[in-house]
């Protein structure tokens, strides 16, 4: 990235604490326009905390967070109005149909040709026959398709995804993966949280591996390998199986821990 390019996401000394429990240790992160950045870790690694702090869903205990020039701690509502988010384990409103919810989001986002866009995304996700079914009566996979459609419908400049392919069958996983890669080629930027390492190799320009709220390493997939024969799974097991101190030498300038309190 050129030095003159300002990051779309910039967090300095960002941390989250609940009383004496540190959910996310202080860290710095930058994501620039056109990047597909991924955060990967085992279950319970606090990946979701990472993304919720950046998107204003949680308030950081400390640190400065700017996303698209908006201070996430001071104005989370303005921030959420300007990005796309697919949260983990969140369903569309049970009392709305997919068509109604898509229309609501499209109006909120100022989308042109709303009726046309709603039909396009219902068809794209194979949901045309469920367009007027109450969301509470949809399957988990169908509800996830609705959530993805609401994030895609306005083609946001910056898209945050937390385990986006949960409950999707392989056909729609692949279809969504191809759309996301094209979105980045068209100038979009994506911040992804997942435990599926295959997504890093297929999709990410850069990635970070975290565990117990600590960043163990960050960089390109190739750059994280200490030997060409290493697989990403080898890298993951090596890093997650070691302490944060042992992992220090694998860090990249993209994500770094701040000095801890």
What are these regions (language model features)?
Residues 103, 107-130:
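Conserved ABC ATPase "signature" region
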Residues 134-138:
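Conserved ABC ATPase signature
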Residues 159-163:
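Catalytic Walker B motif of ABC-type/P-loop ATPase nucleotide-binding domains
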Residues 155:
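Conserved catalytic motifs of ABC-family nucleotide-binding domains
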Residues 218-219:
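ABC ATPase "signature
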């Amino acid at each position: 990235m050129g030095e003159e390019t300002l990051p779309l996401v910039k967090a300095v000394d960002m941390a989250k604490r609940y009383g004496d429990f540190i959910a996310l240790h202080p860290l710095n992160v930058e994501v620039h326009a056109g990047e597909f950045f991924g955060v990967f870790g085992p279950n319970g690694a606090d990946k979701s905390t990472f993304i919720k702090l950046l998107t204003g869903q949680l308030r950081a205990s400390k640190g400065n967070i700017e996303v698209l020039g908006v201070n996430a701690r001071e104005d989370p509502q303005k921030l959420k109005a300007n990005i796309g988010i697919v949260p983990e384990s969140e369903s569309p409103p049970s009392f709305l149909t997919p068509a109604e919810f898509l229309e609501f989001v499209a109006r909120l986002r100022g989308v042109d040709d709303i009726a046309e866009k709603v039909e396009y995304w219902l068809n794209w996700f194979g949901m045309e026959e469920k367009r007027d079914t109450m969301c509470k009566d949809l399957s988990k996979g169908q509800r996830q398709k609705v959530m993805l459609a609401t994030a895609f419908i306005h083609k946001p400049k910056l898209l945050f995804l937390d385990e986006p392919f949960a409950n999707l069958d392989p056909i729609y996983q692949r279809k969504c993966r191809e759309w996301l890669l094209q979105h980045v080629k068209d100038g979009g930027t994506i911040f992804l949280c997942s435990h599926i390492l295959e997504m890093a190799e297929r999709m990410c320009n850069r990635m970070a591996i975290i565990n117990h709220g600590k960043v163990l390493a960050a960089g390109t997939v190739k750059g994280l390998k200490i030997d060409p024969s290493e697989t990403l799974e080898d890298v993951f097991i090596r890093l997650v199986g070691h302490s944060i101190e042992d992992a220090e030498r694998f860090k990249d300038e993209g994500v770094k821990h701040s000095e801890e309190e």
